[in-house]
């Protein structure tokens, strides 16, 4: 509770089963590779406070189950996410092929403005690569995504991926493209900024109550 | 002693057959060749730094040994009781030596390889009565050190588990006692580390109590049908007390009736294994093999026998139920079963869980789990209005936290001792137990104002739900709370109807209609009775929506043929058939089973006496049972009334603040359950 930050962003990590979503999250939070992990059933999460462009931002990251049949359940996690890591495995074309479906999910269920970064994970397994960098980066361009190849094992580009996503969101806030005060933006003001602002949070806190549906 | 060693000596062979890439006699060609070949690149996740370690060539060589040792430890994992009483089981197992190995093997090895710091050997030697257990008990410490070491070394060669273990300690809490060498020991359940590692804190049951319980269970096994149909309350009570670890595997199979399924489908499992399987499923399964209880010795080794068996049964299931395929949440469930029984038995047990206990949980769309989430939330309103209100305000959907709990039957959530106790009750009483455990957990995590103070936001609340207070998960506490929570099958069914109605109104028809859920072993038993007499198609009465799937299963060869004869002979031992399981050889009169406990002549005398006494006691017990049932009914009436009153009060309390919502929700009044036959409702209430 003592931690102060300017903003809080809700992030998602999505993508097919076995692409290394949980490992990416673990690497980002703990700075090491998670060797013996369970596969995710339902949801896992973690959070970390990072410094982006002079602002402290708390990232609240929700890591989801990848198997297709969990989608109906994981959808409930999407609500109000500001950013997402869309993960595929560069050694598995199948995981790449399902990207479009994941993207649609994210944009329809979270928010059309959600900032998505495409992550080709398992970069360290280059010899077994099935998806080229070029191909994926073309896909990213077509769908207006940022793109990085990452390795949860070595840690390469992992932090970068999260930070890049956060930076983009901050920029959009600055430019007015994103309004943190809009419900479901996935962005909240932290304590630090609250002191300067005229308590926009109280409005937010009250909001959910009346709709006791 | 020689008896004990017999099957034990066999084990390396059988295991080796399985572990080596060349398929063993019974093993289908498809599977084993596929597994290793896949696990090699299955170093897939074993990226460069890892890859050299697993050196798969080493692996296959060592696996056999690992397997053998593992088998022993797993069962030793059943705890002190298992080892001390291993004598009982060993002797039983013995005649069936050649029978399907692993389970027999496990039992036999128990005493020999125990790594557990537990005091078994001492206990054994103190117990003068049990000569035969003395043997392996003594040989234990002698043989154990080198075996253990080389085993562990081999494991560390093959997977990263041990190394990463050191890292993981940090996440186990600062006061963790595990450090340095201690890391290399398994706890009594076979865990090498991880969050479910049990320290030495476990309370263990006194030996004589454990033995008494075993005898009682053996007696039940020998008259199983009778016990289930006439004295179910007692069976339930005994499950709640905890099934003796030495007999747990068998009890689960009896309770779920997977035992009969296995008998009726000889060779079916092998056949399924041999079938090619859909690559779509196989790929996912393979990705998950090394992700099940990676800290359990049985599953720690990449491509080890635990993972291979896991592959076998998960694959078999996708062929058995192609319409269902594979769901990732099935893997932990299957793994828990595998920790206790050989693959074929585990498979049929899994089938029962997926088809009878939790139909639809693992099906595409996961509607059943979402529906249960809603049911759970409705029940929470009664069990803990505070927690309910909090979650509602935070807009935390039930599926956000209960998915893993329910789908894995808490296998990944609770400390291991509690997992086993929960599973014991679950097999007997069905899904009700899952609901109750979840309710208890929530009540003790979010059920008071102070507790809620630290969960101001959604995220904090979720975090709290991911890190449940340890004391509420502690075995005895949890079981006590669970057994006293007034959530009955009838209540669940009522809520089911209500939520289903809501679902239809808001989301339309269910995409997938699972067969009817059976609440535990009595319901399964009753269904079986209804089906097996030459009733013909009228069994459709049971489950209209389920008909289709049942039909497809029939095609799979599940139901009818053998039963009638067996049905008639409900009384005495289903002996010979059971032998085939390799679990329970000679005619298991309860007393016969105790033979190995003492020197034989003496025991025989004792046995006869005991038999007499037993009969007398049986009569008395039946009388008492009847009385108790009366009382039980009265109590239930009373409780119902209380429940109603409480609801009234609750409503009043809520009414003040939320009169609007109350109307919307409507009282969960009797009209909800009205469409169920009230007779069955009363009976179901009596279960609770």
From Swiss-Prot, chain A:
Q: Which residues carry this modification: 5-glutamyl serotonin?
A: 67
Which residues are involved in binding Mg(2+)?
22, 40, 63
EC number(s) from the headed UniProt entry: 3.6.5.2
The cross-references to InterPro entries, in alphabetical order and at most eight, read: P-loop_NTPase, Rab4, Rab_GTPases_membrane_traffic, Small_GTP-bd, Small_GTPase
- Motif stretch (Switch 2): 65-74
One MF term from GO for this chain? Answer: GTP binding
One of the GO biological process terms: Rab protein signal transduction
The record's keywords, sorted A to Z, are: Acetylation, Cell membrane, Endosome, GTP-binding, Hydrolase, Lipoprotein, Magnesium, Membrane, Metal-binding, Methylation, Nucleotide-binding, Phosphoprotein, Prenylation, Protein transport, Transport
Per the record, residues carrying N-acetylalanine are 2
Residues carrying lipid (S-geranylgeranyl cysteine): 211, 213
Tell me, in one coarse class, where this protein mainly resides.
Answer: membrane
Any idea which residues bear Phosphoserine here? 185, 193
Sites binding GTP sit at 18-23, 37, 39-40, 66, 121-122, 124, 152-153
Identify the cofactor(s): Mg(2+)
Cysteine methyl ester: modified positions: 213
Reactions accelerated catalytically: GTP + H2O = GDP + phosphate + H(+)
Gene3D superfamilies the record matches: P-loop containing nucleotide triphosphate hydrolases
Activity-regulation annotation: Regulated by guanine nucleotide exchange factors (GEFs) which promote the exchange of bound GDP for free GTP. Regulated by GTPase activating proteins (GAPs) which increase the GTP hydrolysis activity. Inhibited by GDP dissociation inhibitors (GDIs).
Q: Write out the residue ranges of the motif Switch 1.
A: 39-44
- Give the matching SUPFAM superfamilies: P-loop containing nucleoside triphosphate hydrolases (SSF52540)
Q: Name one GO cellular component term.
A: perinuclear region of cytoplasm
Where can this protein be found?
Cell membrane; Early endosome membrane
Assembly information from the UniProt record: Interacts (GTP-bound form) with RUFY1; the interaction allows endosomal tethering and fusion.
Q: What name does the UniProt record give this protein? A: Ras-related protein Rab-4B
Organism of derivation: Homo sapiens (Human)
């Amino acid at each position: 509770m003592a931690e102060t930050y300017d903003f809080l962003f809700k992030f998602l990590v999505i993508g097919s089963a076995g692409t290394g979503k949980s490992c990416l999250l673990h690497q980002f939070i703990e700075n090491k590779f998670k060797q013996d992990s369970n596969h995710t059933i339902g949801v896992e999460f973690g959070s970390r406070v990072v410094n982006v462009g002079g602002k402290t931002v708390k990232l609240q990251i929700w890591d989801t189950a990848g198997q297709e049949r969990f989608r109906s359940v994981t959808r409930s996690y999407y609500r109000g996410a500001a950013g997402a890591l869309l993960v595929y495995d560069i050694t598995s074309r199948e995981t790449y092929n399902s990207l479009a479906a994941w993207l649609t999910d994210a944009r329809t269920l979270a928010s059309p403005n959600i900032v998505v970064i495409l992550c080709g994970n398992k970069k360290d397994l280059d010899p077994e690569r099935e998806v080229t960098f070029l191909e994926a980066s073309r896909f990213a361009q077509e769908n207006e995504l940022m793109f990085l190849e990452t390795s949860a094992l070595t840690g390469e580009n992992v932090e970068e991926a999260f930070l890049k996503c956060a930076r983009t969101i901050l920029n959009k806030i600055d430019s007015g493209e994103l309004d943190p005060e809009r419900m479901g933006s996935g962005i909240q003001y932290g304590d630090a900024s609250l002191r300067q602002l005229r308590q926009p949070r109280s409005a937010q806190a009250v909001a959910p109550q009346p709709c006791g549906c | 002693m020689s008896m004990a060693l017999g099957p034990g000596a066999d084990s390396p062979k059988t295991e080796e057959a399985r572990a080596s890439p060349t398929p063993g006699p019974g093993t289908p060609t498809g599977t084993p060749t596929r597994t290793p070949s896949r696990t090699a690149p299955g170093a897939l996740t074993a990226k460069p730094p890892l890859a050299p370690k697993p050196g798969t060539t080493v692996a296959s060589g060592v696996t056999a040994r690992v397997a053998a040792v593992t088998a022993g430890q797993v069962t030793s994992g059943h705890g002190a009781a298992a080892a001390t009483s291993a004598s009982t089981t060993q002797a039983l197992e013995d005649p069936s030596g050649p029978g399907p190995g692993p389970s027999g093997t496990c039992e036999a090895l128990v005493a020999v390889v125990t790594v557990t710091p537990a005091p078994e050997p001492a206990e054994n030697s103190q117990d003068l009565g049990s000569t035969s257990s003395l043997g392996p008990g003594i040989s234990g410490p002698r043989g154990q050190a080198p075996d253990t070491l080389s085993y562990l070394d081999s494991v560390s060669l093959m997977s990263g588990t041990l190394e990463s273990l050191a890292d993981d300690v940090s996440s186990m809490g600062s006061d963790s006692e595990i450090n340095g060498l201690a890391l290399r020991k398994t706890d009594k359940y076979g865990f090498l580390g991880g969050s479910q590692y049990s320290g030495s804190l476990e309370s263990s049951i006194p030996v004589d109590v454990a033995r008494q319980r075993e005898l009682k269970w053996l007696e039940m096994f020998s008259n199983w049908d009778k016990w289930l149909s006439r004295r179910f309350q007692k069976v339930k009570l005994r499950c709640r007390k905890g099934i003796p670890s030495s007999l747990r595997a068998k009890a689960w199979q009896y309770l779920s009736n997977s035992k009969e399924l296995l008998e009726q489908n000889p060779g079916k499992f092998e056949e399924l294994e041999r079938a090619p399987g859909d690559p779509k499923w196989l790929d996912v399964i393979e990705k998950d093999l090394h992700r099940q209880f990676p800290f359990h010795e049985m599953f720690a080794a990449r491509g080890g026998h635990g993972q291979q068996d896991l592959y076998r049964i998960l694959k078999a299931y996708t062929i058995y139920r192609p319409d269902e395929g594979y769901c990732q949440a099935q893997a932990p469930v299957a793994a828990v079963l595998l920790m206790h029984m050989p693959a074929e038995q585990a498979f049929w047990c899994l089938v029962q869980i997926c088809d009878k206990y939790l139909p639809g949980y693992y099906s595409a769309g996961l509607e059943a789990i979402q529906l249960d989430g809603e049911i759970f939330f409705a029940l929470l309103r009664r069990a803990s209005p505070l927690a309910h209100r909090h979650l509602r305000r935070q807009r935390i959907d039930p599926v956000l936290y209960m998915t893993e709990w329910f789908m894995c039957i808490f296998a990944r959530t609770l400390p291991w001792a509690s997992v086993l106790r929960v599973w014991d009750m679950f097999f007997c009483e069905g899904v009700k137990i899952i609901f109750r455990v979840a309710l208890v957990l929530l009540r003790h995590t979010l059920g008071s104002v102070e507790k809620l103070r630290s969960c101001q936001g959604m995220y904090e609340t979720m975090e709290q739900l991911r890190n449940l207070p340890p004391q509420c998960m502690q075995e005895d506490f949890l079981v006590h709370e669970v057994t006293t929570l007034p959530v009955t099958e009838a209540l669940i069914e009522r809520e089911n109807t209500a939520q289903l109605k809501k679902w239809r109104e808001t989301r339309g028809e269910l995409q997938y209609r699972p067969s009817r859920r059976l609440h535990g072993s009595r319901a399964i038993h009753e269904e079986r009775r209804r089906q097996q007499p030459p009733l013909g198609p009228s069994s459709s009465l049971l489950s209209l929506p389920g008909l289709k799937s049942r039909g497809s299963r029939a095609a799979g060869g599940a139901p009818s043929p053998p039963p009638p004869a067996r049905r008639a002979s409900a009384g005495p031992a289903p002996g010979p058939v059971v032998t085939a399981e390799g679990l329970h050889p000679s005619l298991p009169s309860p007393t016969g089973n105790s033979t190995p406990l003492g020197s034989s002549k003496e025991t025989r005398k004792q046995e006869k006496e005991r038999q007499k006494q037993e009969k007398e006691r049986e009569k008395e017990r039946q009388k008492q049972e009847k009385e108790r049932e009366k009382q039980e009914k009265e109590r239930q009436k009373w409780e119902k009334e209380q429940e109603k009153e409480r609801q009234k009060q609750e409503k009043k309390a809520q009414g003040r603040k939320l009169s609007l919502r109350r109307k919307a929700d409507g009282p969960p009044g009797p009209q909800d359950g009205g469409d169920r036959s009230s007779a069955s409702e009363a009976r179901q209430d009596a279960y609770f």
